[in-house]
Amino acid sequence: MTSKLNLDPKVIDSARTSAAHIAQSMQEFIDKHTTVSTERTILRLLGIDGVDDVERPLPNVIVDAVKDAGGLPRGVAYWIGNAILRTGKKPQEIAEAIGRGELDLMKLEQGSAEAAAKAIEPYVNKALEHIRRQTEKRNEYLTTIGEGRRPYLYVIVATGNIYEDVIQAQAAARQGADIIAVIRTTAQSLLDYVPYGPTTEGFGGTYATQENFRIMRKALDEVGEEIGRYIRLCNYSSGLCMPEIAAMGALERLDVMLNDALYGILFRDINMQRTLVDQYFSRIINGFAGIIINTGEDNYLTTADAVEEAHTVLASQFINEQFALRAGLPEEQMGLGH
């Protein structure tokens, strides 16, 4: 069979092989390292949420305390598991006690890693089961009420006020939109924490928070049932809190995520090593939750000539594909370029 584009399969295979070498060399680094955002994500998946009395997210409070005491290389899951054994409290109760200054994880008697892992196992399983149920709910909607014709119509809302976004999103769905993307407020990708609760003020977009995800998901389910068509929800899993937003999206049944470390490196000056570690964990989560990812090559073409710099886009797409495969993301969930 002749390709419609008359592309040379040997050149494509060669490019994939080169990209695989690049991704694998980085993967060896990724497998040996963690980041503060990856550790905060683990806390969120253990059910820890909320803020302390000065509005600091509890995952940040815990990870910062563990990091300052030199305990982060052991992994925050160990410290929470050990605290469960020593105090008899649940992860959320432990987090709240830390937030009030009543508990220091590092001063507790330290047990074995195996015992700590066993202590957190019920909470891990609870999170996984919740995400599985959300995936099943999506599939149930697609089976019962169906979806729009392809290609999907993609509409952006970005008022800064999640409640105004809901009105616009439902109106767009009634007019034929298949995917609603809620653009994040300007520079949220450079915040090293995820804001808490519903938000009504933003700049050029709306804050990505778990409560905002929940509000919009509920609204799109309602309008989807009304018009007889499942409406997908898209947000942005990139920047300094990439895996945290992926976890929040998995818990609240988002369907599509912009998910790319490379444009964060090129356009946001984000630490290369950190963001590639974060990307790996975020893509594991997206893969498990059935979330489609789109990468960020379109950003390159906002600053350069599309023809002259086409090779940079192709290189990024090949590398992104290989990183996604190493995270276990099915090809059906890979969207290259946005």
What are these regions, as identified by a protein language model?
Residues 226-230, 327-334:
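Flexible, glycine/charged-enriched surface loops at secondary-structure junctions
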Residues 182-184:
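Active-site/pore-lining binding-face segments in mid-to-C-terminal subdomains
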Residues 1-163, 171-176, 187-215, 237-257, ...:
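Long, compositionally biased, glycine/small-hydrophobic-enriched stretches that function as flexible linkers
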Residues 321:
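Ligand/cofactor-recognition surfaces for anionic moieties
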Residues 218-235:
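A glycine-rich, acidic short-motif signal
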